[in-house]
Swiss-Prot record:
Biological processes per GO annotation: blastocyst hatching
Segments in the Cytoplasmic topological domain: 71-99
Pfam families: DUF2615 (PF11027)
Organism: Rattus norvegicus (Rat)
Entry protein name: Small integral membrane protein 14
Localization (cell): Endoplasmic reticulum membrane
Family annotation (InterPro entries): Uncharacterised_CD034/YQF4
Topology in membrane: Single-pass membrane protein
PANTHER family tied to this protein: SMALL INTEGRAL MEMBRANE PROTEIN 14 (PTHR31019:SF1)
Amino acid sequence: MAEGGFDPCECICSHEHAMRRLINLLRQSQSYCTDTECLRELPGPSGDSGISITVILMAWMVIAVLLFLLRPPNLRGSSLPGKPSSPHSGQDPPAPPVD
């Protein structure tokens, strides 16, 4: 607690507000649980929401492979036998003329 009896944390989250949230949480859980059983399916988003994270990751992998296979020839770095890999055919470039 701060000096003078003023608590700045109480401006953000008071004890009454915390107790109100706790009571609401207990009331919600009581509507889904009885004395003998608790229902497994609570309200909210269900487990089978259609598309899972695995399907999304597999789709991204397929897109990445397709982009890799369909990249332009200048990014492929191909080394064809009749085509030199560099403009100087593996030799050092000529030295500049000295005047």
